[in-house]
């Protein structure tokens, strides 16, 4: 495993920078903890050589394991209309999935 190995992967409508052997919090994925998932939409892979997709790399994938499901910190939204007695306070917590990225194999 190269210390500079990384991949840019598109999942859940966002692009993430993944390094092997680390864990990341991404948008909720509907699967059980312990399940293995495979990301096929790889945009960029730096492993033994640099591979750039146009837009995606064919026959390339990144494997991960779901560690747990969690919620993000609460985001508060406060809506107030000046000179009126209208005040509303909303709070929301995003559902997240913590994943572990497995080491990359051959390109």
Swiss-Prot record:
Any keyword Lipid biosynthesis?
no
Where found?
A: Plastid, Chloroplast
GO molecular-function term, one example from the UniProt record: rRNA binding
InterPro entries, per this entry? bL21-like, bL21-like_sf, Ribosomal_bL21
What the record says about family reads: Belongs to the bacterial ribosomal protein bL21 family.
Summary of subunit composition and partner proteins: Part of the 50S ribosomal subunit.
What is its biological role? This protein binds to 23S rRNA.
State the protein's name. Answer: Large ribosomal subunit protein bL21c
Q: Which organism is it from?
A: Cyanidioschyzon merolae (strain NIES-3377 / 10D)
Name the encoding gene, please: rpl21
């Amino acid at each position: 495993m190269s210390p500079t190995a990384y991949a840019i992967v598109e999942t859940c409508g966002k692009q993430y920078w993944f390094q092997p052997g680390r864990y990341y919090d991404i948008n909720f994925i509907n699967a059980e903890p312990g399940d293995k998932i495979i990301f096929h939409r790889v945009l960029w892979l730096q492993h033994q050589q640099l591979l750039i997709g146009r837009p995606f790399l064919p026959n390339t994938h990144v494997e991960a394991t779901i560690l747990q499901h969690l919620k993000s910190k609460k985001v508060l939204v406060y809506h107030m209309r000046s000179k009126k007695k209208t005040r509303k306070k909303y709070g929301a917590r995003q559902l997240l999935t913590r994943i572990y990225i497995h080491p990359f194999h051959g390109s």
